[in-house]
């Protein structure tokens, strides 16, 4: 009870709208998160006030005072707008649905749906700019144990991701968690190997990093920031776009929050995207690869050394299967096998011990002695699927925007999924900085700057699947790649291989592909250049 309100209440206690307005003002003074028991306490306080003023121990509030009671369920939580002055509250009209302006009064906090790599990085980026952030993640806290939900746990960090991590001051902590990969080691069916460097010098490398370890680091730093609150086991159930309200499920309860604005960073099967696009004119395309994947482990030697070359991405290319290996800091390797879902020698036909051994004896005989737990790992590890997602629009007005896989999931074969998601965060922050308070313009500019290029990345990722599966073992392909490296060495500012532009620069994906096409046309259009290319390529191949 606020003493300064007593004189006014004594004069106007018989007016139900005054009592209702007072109750609303009381609730606003509570601030923050209001549960049902707090609401009940407020009602009780107001009843006691009436009794005190009337000297009536049996006074009770009429139904008109209980405005809003049915709207706050026993297990709900809602963010209530900040308090208005007492005289303003008294003059307020009868209760109306909350508006966007009311929601923004909650200290301007942003809700990020999804606490994975992109969500946790963006939370930290916003917090460093003084923005309050609430991260809602449907899974339990990954720092307390568990796995990555069946997804590949090793990722290739390259220039775009490095740039984003540098912007938030974390790159010096991330790099020690990674293993440098200087190129590919191609394993032939006969057991032979061939090394293909990633670039023309030792600086053009990739970095293998454990997804879970990186996610834990980002969450730790986000949680340490006073502007960030992390909420695990919170699944987005519904988005009320008109009221600008999120409804989440947590431990069997429904929670309603009303942030200033929302970021959907909840992955390829994004609930935020589904809710944002519900009832809207939106484009959406989802494409599954007819191949799936299964993860296996190649353990380190007893002394901690690696059974195969550590500082490389290992590839076993086969027409009917593809093995890729990422190194780990402890000397082990995470192997990912890609196979067709159906047909001969597929996941559908490789279900028992005999079939597993026969598959490896046929396609990957050099791996068999290195994998003593092959059958057990095969039986215990799930089979995952791969999807490409393209959609539009990526935002709605100035209130909700998507980043990462939620708006552009790609196949993993170019190693750019995480890097492009991190680049989204950088691009969104830059757009917000350029457009100031005009968030709708910032969201539109962000999408315009990114969507054409992530669409290009989707096509590049598909094409690289064919490259890894078939082309990397071709002498002509290898000679062409070496020619690219040689031309880049002699003409570093003029000739850039496509892979160099994608992995080792921040040139937008679409611009990189367009430049690569121009270079190809120039080379093909010059008889002298073509003859020289063949000669140089042959020399490099034989060298």
Where are the predicted features?
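Conserved mid-domain beta->alpha element of the FAD-binding
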Residues: 115-128, 264, 296, 382-463, ...
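Beta1/beta-strand and adjacent pyrophosphate-binding region of the FAD-binding site
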Residues: 102-116
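Conserved FAD-binding catalytic core of PHBH/FMO-like flavoproteins
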Residues: 220, 225, 234-238, 243-386, ...
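Glycine-rich FAD pyrophosphate-binding loop
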Residues: 127-149
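Charged, low-complexity interaction regions
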Residues: 13, 17, 28-39
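Conserved Rossmann-like nucleotide-cofactor binding loop
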Residues: 118, 141, 269
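Active-site-adjacent segment of FAD-dependent monooxygenases/related oxidoreductases
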Residues: 146-221
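C-terminal helical "tail/cap" subdomain of flavin- and related membrane-associated enzymes
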Residues: 93-104, 430-543
């Amino acid at each position: 009870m606020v003493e300064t309100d007593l004189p006014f209440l004594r004069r106007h206690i018989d007016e139900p709208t005054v009592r209702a307005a007072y109750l609303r003002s009381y609730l606003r003074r509570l601030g923050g998160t209001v549960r049902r028991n707090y609401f009940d306490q407020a009602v009780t306080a107001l009843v006691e006030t009436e009794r005190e003023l009337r000297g009536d121990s049996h006074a009770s509030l009429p139904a008109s005072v209980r405005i809003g009671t049915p709207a706050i369920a026993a297990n709900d939580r809602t963010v209530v707008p900040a308090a208005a002055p007492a005289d303003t509250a008294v003059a307020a009209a009868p209760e109306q649905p909350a508006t966007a302006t009311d929601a923004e009064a909650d200290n301007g906090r942003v809700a990020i749906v999804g606490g994975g790599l992109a969500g946790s990085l963006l939370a930290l980026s916003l917090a460093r700019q003084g923005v309050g952030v609430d991260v809602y993640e449907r899974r339990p806290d990954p720092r307390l144990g568990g796995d990555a939900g069946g997804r590949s746990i090793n990722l290739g960090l390259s220039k775009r991701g490095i740039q984003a991590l540098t912007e938030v001051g974390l790159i010096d902590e991330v790099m020690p968690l990674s293993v440098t990969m200087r190129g590919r080691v191609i394993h032939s069916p006969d057991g032979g190997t061939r090394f293909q460097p990633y670039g023309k010098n030792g600086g053009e490398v990739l970095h293998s990093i454990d997804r879970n370890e990186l996610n834990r680091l980002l969450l730790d730093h986000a949680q340490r920031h006073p502007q960030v609150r992390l909420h695990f086991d919170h699944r987005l159930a519904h988005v009320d776009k008109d009221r600008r309200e999120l409804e989440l499920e947590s431990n069997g309860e429904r929670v309603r929050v009303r942030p200033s604005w929302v970021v959907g960073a909840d992955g390829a099967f994004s609930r935020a995207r589904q809710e944002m696009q519900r009832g809207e004119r939106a484009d959406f395309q989802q494409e599954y690869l007819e191949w799936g994947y299964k993860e296996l482990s190649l353990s380190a030697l007893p002394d901690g050394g690696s059974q195969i070359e550590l500082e490389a991405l290992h590839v076993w290319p086969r027409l009917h299967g593809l093995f890729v290996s990422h190194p780990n800091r402890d000397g082990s390797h995470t192997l990912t096998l890609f196979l067709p879902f159906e047909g001969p020698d597929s996941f559908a036909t490789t279900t028992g011990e005999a079939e597993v051994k026969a598959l490896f004896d046929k396609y990957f005989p050099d791996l068999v002695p290195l994998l003593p737990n092959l059958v057990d790992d095969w039986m215990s590890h799930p089979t995952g699927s791969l999807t490409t997602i393209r959609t539009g629009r990526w935002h709605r007005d100035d209130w909700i925007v998507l980043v990462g896989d939620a708006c552009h999931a790609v196949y993993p074969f170019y190693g750019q999924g995480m890097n492009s998601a991190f680049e989204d965060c950088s691009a969104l922050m830059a757009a917000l900085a350029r457009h100031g308070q005009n968030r709708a313009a910032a969201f539109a500019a962000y999408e315009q700057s990114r969507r054409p290029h992530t669409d290009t990345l989707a096509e590049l990722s598909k094409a690289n699947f064919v490259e890894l599966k078939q082309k990397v073992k071709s002498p002509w392909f290898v000679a062409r790649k070496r020619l690219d490296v040689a031309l880049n060495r002699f003409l570093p500012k003029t000739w850039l291989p496509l892979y160099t532009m994608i992995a080792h620069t921040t040139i937008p994906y679409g611009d990189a592909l367009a430049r690569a096409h121009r270079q190809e046309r120039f080379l093909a259009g010059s008889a002298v250049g073509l003859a020289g290319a063949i000669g140089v390529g042959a020399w490099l191949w034989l060298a």
